[in-house]
Amino acid sequence: MKTPLLGMTLAELKEVARSLGMPAFTGGQIAKWIYGSHVRDIAEMTNISKANREKLAEQYCIGVMENIDAQHSVDGTIKYLFPVASGKFVETVFIPDKDRATLCVSCQVGCKMNCLFCQTGKQGFEGSLTAADILNQIYSLPEAERLTNIVFMGQGEPMDNLDNVLRATEVLTAEWGYAWSPKRITVSSVGVRNKLKRFLDESECHVAISLHSPIPEQRATLMPAQKGMGIEEVVELLRQYDFSHQRRLSFEYIVFDGLNDSMTHARAIVNLLKGLDCRINLIRFHQIPDAPLKTSDEKKMEVLRDYLTQHGIFTTIRASRGQDIFAACGLLSTKKIYERIK
C-alpha cells in the first residue's frame, strides 16, 4: 500500500525526499506540484529527475480518489460521494452562487454528537478522516478552480478530529500549500472542551458555533454535547478572542416551530451574546425521519431576525440549497449508500 503525499506538510515532504536520498529542496518541488499544480501522478513532476520520480513512486502516490457519484439539484448545488482511506464514503456539497462558490467538506464518517435534528448523527460514528481524505474532497472536485470558500460543515464534528482538520487547514493556508487566506475558510463546532480553545489558538480561520437554543436545558435535549461543554462556557471562551478584524465568529441557529422561535428565546440570545462581536445565521429545519421537530414559518424567522438585528447582532436567514438531493443542512448521511455498495 503506497503512502499518499496529499496532506503532508512541507517539512514532511522534505523528510520524504531526504529519506530517499534526494536533496531537501525536492520536497519543496513536490509541494509545488501537488498544491500548486494539482498533478494527478508523480510522473507529471517534470523538474524532478526521472530516476527520482520512479524512486518516489515506488513508495508513494499523490493520493487522489475521484468521486464515485454526483447528484445535481435544480438550484445548481451538486452533492458528491467520495471514498476515503478506510473504505467508507463521505458526502461533499458544492454550492455555486452568483459571485462565489462554496464547498462544504466532511471531516468524519458519521458523527458522535448525535444532535436530535441531524441525519449524520443518526448514522453513528464510523471513523475520522485523514488530512488526505479531507483535502481530496477539494483536490478531486471537478469545480475546484471555481472555489472561493470552504466550510467544514459536512459530516462530522471538526473538533473531534482536530489534528487532521488543523493539518488540512494548514495545507490550505500555507504559502507552500494552496496559499488561501484563512478568511476563506470557516470551521464549525458544537463546542468541545479543550479542543475548541486549541483550534482558536492554532488557527486563524473563521469559526461557526452551533447554538440552536440559548437555554442550556433545552439545548441539551437538542444537542447532547451541551452536557460536555455548555453554551455559557463556549461563549465565555470566545470572549477571550478578538473577532473585530479579519476573523469572523458566527452562530448557527436552526429555527424549530414552537420550540426555539419565541421572543423569550430572542431575548435570551441577546443576553447570552451581549458585547460579543458576532453574527447569527438562522437556518430552516429540514425534516429527517423520527425527529419530533418542525421548521418554523417564514414570518417567525423574519421577526426573530429583525429583533436580533435591532439589538446589535447582525442576523441573516440562510437560503436552503440542495434540499431536493438531501444536501441541505442536517441531511448528509452515507449509511444507506455504504450498505448498498458493500
Where are these regions (language model features)?
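Ferredoxin-type iron-sulfur electron-transfer modules in oxidoreductases and energy-metabolism complexes
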Residues: 132, 136-144
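Canonical Radical SAM [4Fe-4S] cluster-binding loop centered on the CxxxCxxC motif
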Residues: 96-133
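Generic beta-strand structural signal
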Residues: 78, 90, 101-105, 113, ...
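P-loop NTP-binding catalytic core
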Residues: 86-95, 99-100
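Conserved AdoMet/S-adenosylmethionine-binding subsite of the radical SAM
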Residues: 142-149, 154-318
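Short linear Ser/Thr-Pro motifs
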Residues: 73, 106-107, 188, 210
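Auxiliary Fe-S-binding modules of radical SAM enzymes
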Residues: 1-90, 239-247, 255-342
